[in-house]
């Protein structure tokens, strides 16, 4: 199946040509925006969240055609296959059952395994939080260091930061991912080996960055007084390869299992989230799962016309494949959600940044847009200039938390006002005539610089309060959005072959950096020159 061979495609293309030059300002004009208002018609709820799609460049007819596109592309069938545990990751011959990690139905796939591992996590987290689990000198754990990269880092880091307000104040959680030694070194400056627990997270337990950092941390413990025989008090492992964890030197009792039917970027709900559970406690971790389950149920049961993940995905396709948008922005007006854009970068681009269809043919249409973002209001003072007046179309997801999770409540109306005002300004713009009035007769030459084209599309997601449950729903919303887009593009969102070639060549280059001699013909001239400069700097 190719996207532009679907029966609905010509109708969508004709509809795009019909409305491409229409301006949102006109659709919101009082003469056109009668009851039910545009905001009422295009605001939908699900999983405890609300989404206002009204400031997007679409009409009722657009949504009807996009929903038809989803049905013709088999979105519902792909969704149902994923939940049923079918092989939806054909290139690796695997299911993608991250939803099973938060299911509560006894007949859901792998429930006995999931429940047993979560109970083990809870016992361990309670022991660490209560002080029953101590370091080698008998001191309680005050620092948890999570070592992992990609999905073993981005998800847990994002959630721990977001839920800081409900986390225990007795334990500081640190995250180390980069093979650059500066990342680990800066954490080592802030921790005490007698009071530190390391969680090493790697599906294979062979990941270069993770194992390099893990070995350096283990050496640091020993160099700072921890007997090798006592390292079991300070190291636990999370992996789908328990034998390799034990080989590293972690006690078998300290191994937590993840499974190959859960992709790394979808894994925070598993033992990969052990650092989350230690920070917020098992009960609140269960609330996080419950929120994701709320969104799972909404995604499974709501008609596509009112289905938040489906609508999110389809609106993204509208801009990517018709308007030609090359990127989209996530702007959470919440400092607690500081790491959400980074998390979504991996979720969206590693999942859907593909050029091969499931059937092995190459696509002849764009797939994943570049995902980027920054919390508000910081972004307003960095790149919103380009969003308002630049020539590039960048669709935006605003995320607003309506009640603060901190005691400085007087700040919150200012934060929300900026969020809502930005969406209004991006939609309305300012005409040249309006700009001339502002510039006045004294400075008419200023008018073009005061003009805003407007018609910049935004979606605003509303969260009543940032809790473990609403955060779980928000994350699951984006997970399912990715699946919807993958189904329409007919690609596999659950593999990541694009990271392999660089890894393979990286091992070759690393060996050349320290070899006695290097054959200059082994690499292209640019890479050979880079290696030569680095060898000189390294003293080789």
Curated annotation (Swiss-Prot):
A single cellular component GO annotation: cytosol
Reactions it catalyzes: alpha-D-glucose 6-phosphate = beta-D-fructose 6-phosphate
Pfam families reported in the protein's UniProt record: PGI (PF00342)
Pathway membership, UniProt: Carbohydrate biosynthesis; gluconeogenesis; Carbohydrate degradation; glycolysis; D-glyceraldehyde 3-phosphate and glycerone phosphate from D-glucose: step 2/4
Enzymatic class: isomerase
GO molecular function (one): monosaccharide binding
Cellular compartments annotated: Cytoplasm
Domain of life of the source: Bacteria
InterPro entries (UniProt xref): G6P_Isomerase (IPR001672), G6P_Isomerase_C (IPR023096), Phosphoglucose_isomerase_CS (IPR018189), SIS_dom_sf (IPR046348), SIS_PGI_1 (IPR035476), SIS_PGI_2 (IPR035482)
EC number(s) given by UniProt: 5.3.1.9
Keyword DNA damage in record: no
Record GO biological process: gluconeogenesis; glucose 6-phosphate metabolic process; glycolytic process
UniProt-listed SUPFAM superfamilies: SIS domain
Keyword entries, A-Z: Cytoplasm, Gluconeogenesis, Glycolysis, Isomerase
Active site, per annotation: 350, 381, 503
Function description: Catalyzes the reversible isomerization of glucose-6-phosphate to fructose-6-phosphate.
Stated family: Belongs to the GPI family.
Entries under PANTHER family matching the protein: GLUCOSE-6-PHOSPHATE ISOMERASE
Protein name: Glucose-6-phosphate isomerase
Organism in which the protein naturally occurs: Burkholderia pseudomallei (strain 668)
Lineage, top ranks: Bacteria, Pseudomonadati, Pseudomonadota, Betaproteobacteria, Burkholderiales
Gene transcribed to yield this protein: pgi
């Amino acid at each position: 199946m190719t996207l532009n061979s679907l029966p609905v495609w010509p109708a969508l293309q004709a509809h795009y040509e019909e409305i491409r030059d229409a301006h949102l300002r006109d659709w919101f004009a009082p003469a056109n925006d009668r009851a039910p208002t545009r905001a009422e018609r295009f605001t939908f709820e699900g999983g405890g969240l609300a989404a206002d799609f009204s400031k997007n460049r679409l009409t009722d007819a657009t949504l009807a055609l996009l929903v038809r596109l989803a049905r013709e592309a088999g979105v519902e069938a792909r969704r149902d296959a994923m939940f049923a545990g079918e092989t939806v990751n054909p290139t690796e011959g695997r299911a993608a059952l991250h939803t099973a990690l938060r299911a509560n139905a006894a007949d859901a796939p792998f429930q006995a395994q999931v429940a047993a591992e979560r109970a083990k996590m809870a016992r361990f987290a309670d022991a660490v939080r209560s002080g029953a689990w101590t370091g080698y000198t008998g001191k309680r754990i005050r620092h948890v260091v999570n070592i992992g990269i990609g999905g073993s880092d981005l998800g847990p880091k994002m959630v721990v930061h977001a839920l800081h307000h409900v986390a225990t104040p007795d334990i500081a959680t640190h995250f180390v991912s980069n093979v650059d030694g500066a990342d680990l070194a800066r954490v080592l400056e802030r921790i005490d080996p007698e009071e530190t627990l390391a969680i090493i997270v790697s599906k294979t337990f062979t990941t270069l960055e993770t194992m390099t950092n893990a070995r350096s941390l283990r050496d640091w413990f020993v160099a700072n007084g921890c007997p090798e025989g006592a390292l079991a008090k300070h190291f636990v492992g999370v992996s789908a390869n328990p034998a390799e964890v034990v080989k590293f030197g972690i006690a078998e009792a300290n191994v937590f299992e993840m499974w190959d039917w859960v992709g790394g970027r979808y894994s925070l709900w598993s033992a990969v989230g052990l650092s989350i559970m230690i920070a917020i406690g098992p009960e609140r971790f269960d609330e996080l799962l419950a929120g994701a389950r709320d969104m799972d149920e909404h995604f499974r049961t709501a008609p596509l016309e009112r289905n938040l993940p489906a609508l999110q995905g389809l609106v993204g396709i509208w801009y990517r494949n018709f308007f030609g948008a090359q990127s989209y922005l996530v702007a959470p007006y919440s400092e607690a959600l500081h790491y959400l854009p980074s998390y979504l970068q991996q979720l969206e681009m590693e999942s859907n940044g593909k050029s091969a269809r499931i059937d092995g043919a190459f696509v002849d249409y764009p797939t994943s847009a570049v995902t980027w973002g920054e919390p508000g209001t910081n972004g307003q003072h960095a790149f919103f200039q380009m969003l308002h007046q630049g020539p590039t179309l960048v669709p935006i997801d605003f995320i607003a938390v309506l009640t603060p999770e901190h005691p400085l409540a007087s700040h919150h109306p200012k934060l929300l006002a900026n969020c809502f005002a930005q969406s209004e300004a991006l939609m309305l713009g300012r005409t040249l005539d309006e700009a001339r009035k502002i510039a006045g007769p004294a400075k008419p030459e200023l008018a073009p610089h005061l003009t805003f084209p407007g018609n910049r599309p935004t979606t605003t997601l509303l969260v009543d309060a940032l809790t473990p449950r609403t955060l779980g729903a928000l994350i699951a919303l984006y997970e399912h959005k990715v699946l919807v887009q993958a189904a329409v593009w007919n690609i596999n969102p659950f593999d990541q072959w694009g990271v392999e070639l660089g890894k393979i060549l990286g091992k070759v280059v690393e060996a050349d950096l320290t070899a006695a001699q290097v054959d200059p013909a082994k690499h292209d001239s640019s890479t050979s020159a880079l290696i030569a400069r680095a060898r000189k700097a390294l003293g080789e």
